[in-house]
Amino acid sequence: IGLLVALAVLVALNIAITPNFLNMRTLAVNASQVSTIAIVALGMTLVIASGGIDLSVGAVMAVAGALAPIVFLSGCAVSNPGLGLAASILLPLLVAALCGAFNGVLIGVLGVQPIIATLIFFISGRGIAQVLTNGNLQTFSNPDFTWLGTGRILGFPVQGWIALALTLVIAWAVR
């Protein structure tokens, strides 16, 4: 109950101090800025709730994020944009799942302590992402892919809807 009181105090302070705090635009901006972290936090919630720790989350995000433009800009994806879009979303998710499986094997099968196992990929994953990108910012343009980050449904950011949907699924799954 203490957290709810703290949240209520923060909301009340923001309402009092910030003139436009309660409008849809502010909510949309906050949702778009927080959604990625919220989605990652959902996964971490499951790890922590089960008594584990995962230091490799940021590195896994970096590897998946580095892989998406590589897949999308490949010859196959350029010749078939629909397939490229699907592959640039699904393949990085699969690679992220395989990274998690690697950590799981280290912990569950080989008996490595979770903090050590995930620290291994924390360090190596950042290196893998650097190698994949040659240390450069990767960019590409596709209206459908861009829509995931900048689009709106009913005035609310798409990534906010995705985070909300995943939150509901996780909340249902842990009940």
Annotate each language-model stretch with its function.
Residues I1, M24-S32, S79-L90, W147-W161:
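Interfacial loop-to-helix junctions that mark the boundaries of transmembrane helices
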